[in-house]
From Swiss-Prot:
Residue ranges, compositional bias (Polar residues): 1-42, 244-260
Superkingdom per UniProt: Eukaryota
Role of this protein: Transcription factor which regulates nonfermentable carbon utilization. Activator of gluconeogenetic genes.
Region (Disordered): 1-59, 209-260
GO cellular component, one term: nucleus
Family annotation (NCBIfam families): sensory_box
Protein name in UniProt: Transcription activator of gluconeogenesis ERT1
Subcellular location: Nucleus
Occurrences of domain PAS (ranges): 476-548
Originating species: Candida glabrata (strain ATCC 2001 / BCRC 20586 / JCM 3761 / NBRC 0622 / NRRL Y-65 / CBS 138) (Yeast)
Keywords assigned by UniProt, alphabetized: Activator, DNA-binding, Gluconeogenesis, Metal-binding, Nucleus, Transcription, Transcription regulation, Zinc
């Protein structure tokens, strides 16, 4: 204890307190102390406050609120409510939203952009309240009208359309996490995000937004467009009511589209840049449905606004209703002119007998349906005129197709990128009219895969890069047109948003659709295939567009819709994908072969 005593004295001289520690080898952790004003008997007091504190349970830490984008940028504390008090004081309450947080890898495809909320912004309701009433109120308020609901009202058909967000429908928001150096890439990514976000909201609320209409009789979910279902073959399918898309009280799909454009787009007030020859007016007045004449008389720009093609009910099963000069009856009635019994071969051409017309004659019994024999298999001989320059293959008004016929013109005259945004927007609008909510969600999920790939490929692209990509597209298409003319296989070329860019003569004979009928307006590949094929289209697109696949891919189901109503051509379709320099899908070449 002598060593301990001397230690006490030394410590006591320094701080006025004598601290005692037991000799080495002791296992006790108890600290004792002698105070200078202790009792004379040298009572030792034990300090157990430190040991008690170490064994007490720590208080639960309060959850930290997620800061808004403004407070997060300034590294300031934020509140849970929105808008927060700091943003209200600064007058920026309309931008007070939760800051985007880093997501796990498996959540990359889910949208991270929050919906704006704030006291100064228009009230769009919670996700379960966004419905036809809010969209109708906003649109009618812009035109100084009272809210109303009519048969042709666009809000009755698209309850949660893009119009629920009138501030910036497709422009990238200021608080968006991904910044693009190109406006074209910005716009395209924004519309993809809008499609996924709105359809995810619709998926949660599709039972809420349905309501009873007093003025119309709704058959329930929107029926399929000219699909090969049981309704197609029923006797009622030939009635005047079924004209392509399902209509309510003889309202055609283009009538609804026409009502939308007449109210909200000022393009009807301006004459479009393209001419309107009599032949084209005659064709589109028939192929655009019951309201085709009104659409053409309004002088709407068919390149900027989408009106779907509606198959026509042909009584005689021919395409004479859209031919300037009807076919010669002596040729069409003579079976020897389109069928050779010796070699089991049919003859089709673009002049008086296309493949849909031949199929109608076979199905109706006017021509004997033959099968493979021991010597000859059933075949079809296609007669096409040689490329003599009389046909129109390029047009400066076709921004979506081949504009120029020489490489020099392409590199010199193309000085702006092609915007895929209107195509995606009108594609979603068209699919909403044609398919049920369940199908839409499945299609949009396939389209959602494109967003993270699109970010990775195009986030560093500039406006000059996008212009160069369009030049590459035009130059590649010009070269492919020369190849396609020599191949002789029915071929269609379309962009990544599904917009048709080119069709060859063989496809005209196979489907019955003329090149000018598909390219003189905004047309999508999904317009000319049936419902089951459209579902397969998006699955196939998701398989090849986002993966490193070289070569070709085959659609499991492909049925072409023809201009003749209820006439469907079953085909095998092979896809060939062409990518641009950044890895994005540049164009898709589809080769179609009929199944006899």
């Amino acid at each position: 204890m002598n060593n301990a005593t001397s230690y006490y004295r030394t410590s006591g001289e320094q701080d006025g307190k004598l601290t005692s520690t037991l000799p080495s080898g002791s296992t006790s952790n108890t600290n004792v102390r002698y105070s200078s004003n202790d009792n004379s008997d040298g009572t030792i007091q034990s300090d157990t406050s430190i040991s008690q504190t170490s064994h007490t349970v720590k208080k639960k830490r309060k959850n930290t609120n997620v800061a808004c984008v403004n407070c997060s940028r300034n590294h300031s504390s934020c509140e849970q409510k929105r808008p927060c008090s700091r943003c209200i004081k600064k007058g920026i309450a309309n931008t007070c939203v939760d800051a985007p947080r880093k997501k796990k890898k498996y959540l990359e495809g889910i949208d991270t952009l929050p919906i704006r909320v704030g006291s100064n912004t228009p009230h769009y309701g919670t996700p379960l309240q966004i419905g036809y009433h809010s969209a109708s109120f906003i649109d009618n308020q812009q035109y100084g009208q009272t809210p109303r609901h009519s048969i042709g009202d666009f809000n009755d058909i698209y309850p949660t359309s893009y119009k629920s967000y009138p501030e910036n429908r497709y422009n990238v928001r200021n608080d968006q996490a991904h910044r693009f150096q190109s406006y074209a890439a910005n716009s395209e990514y924004s519309v993809l995000s809008t499609i996924v976000r709105q359809n995810s909201l619709n998926n949660n609320n599709h039972q809420i937004i349905h309501r009873n209409r007093d003025t119309i009789t709704s058959p329930g979910p929107i029926q399929s467009y000219n699909s090969i279902s049981s309704e197609l073959n029923s006797p009622s399918s030939s009635s005047p009511k079924s004209n392509g898309l399902t209509r309510n009280n003889s309202m055609s799909p283009n009538a609804k589209n026409f009502d939308l454009n007449s109210q909200q787009h000022d393009t009807y007030a301006h004459k479009p840049p393209q001419p309107y020859p009599s032949s084209k007016s005659h064709i589109y007045s028939i192929l655009l449905g019951d309201y085709g004449k009104e659409i053409l008389q309004s002088q709407v720009n068919l390149y900027a606004n989408h009106f779907p093609l509606v198959p026509f009910l042909s009584v005689d099963g021919t395409l004479d209703f859209k031919r300037i000069y009807p076919s010669d009856p002596s040729k069409t009635e003579n079976t020897d002119s389109f069928f050779n019994t010796k070699i089991n071969q049919y003859y089709v051409n673009n002049e008086f007998l296309t493949f849909p017309e031949l199929k109608y004659k076979i199905d109706s019994g006017k021509v004997e349906k033959v099968t493979d024999t021991e010597n000859y298999a059933v075949s079809v001989s296609v007669e096409c005129p040689p490329p003599d320059g009389s046909r129109l293959y390029n047009n400066v008004e076709w921004d979506h197709s081949l504009k120029y016929g020489t490489p020099v013109e392409i590199y010199k005259l193309i000085n702006e990128p092609f915007s895929h945004t209107p195509g995606f927007r009108h594609l979603l609008q068209y699919l909403r009219k044609r398919f049920s909510q369940k199908d839409l969600v499945s299609m949009c999920q396939n389209m959602a895969y494109f967003r993270p790939i699109f970010i990775a490929c195009s986030i560093t692209l500039t406006e000059e890069d996008m212009i160069f990509m369009e030049q590459c597209y035009q130059r590649t298409l010009l070269q492919y047109v020369k190849f396609i003319q020599e191949i002789g296989t029915p071929t269609v070329v379309w962009r990544r948003n599904g917009q048709i860019s080119y069709v060859n003569d063989e496809f005209e004979i196979l489907s019955g659709w003329k090149r000018e009928e598909l390219l003189d307006k905004m047309s999508f590949i999904v317009e000319i295939i049936d419902d089951e094929s459209v579902r397969e289209y998006f699955k196939t697109f998701a398989r090849i567009a986002y993966n490193n696949i070289k070569g070709s891919e085959q659609m499991d189901v492909c049925r072409l819709l023809t201009p003749i109503r209820n006439q469907v051509i079953e085909c095998k379709c092979i896809w060939t994908l062409k990518r641009d320099m950044s890895g994005l899908p540049l164009m898709i070449l589809g080769n179609f072969l009929p199944v006899l």
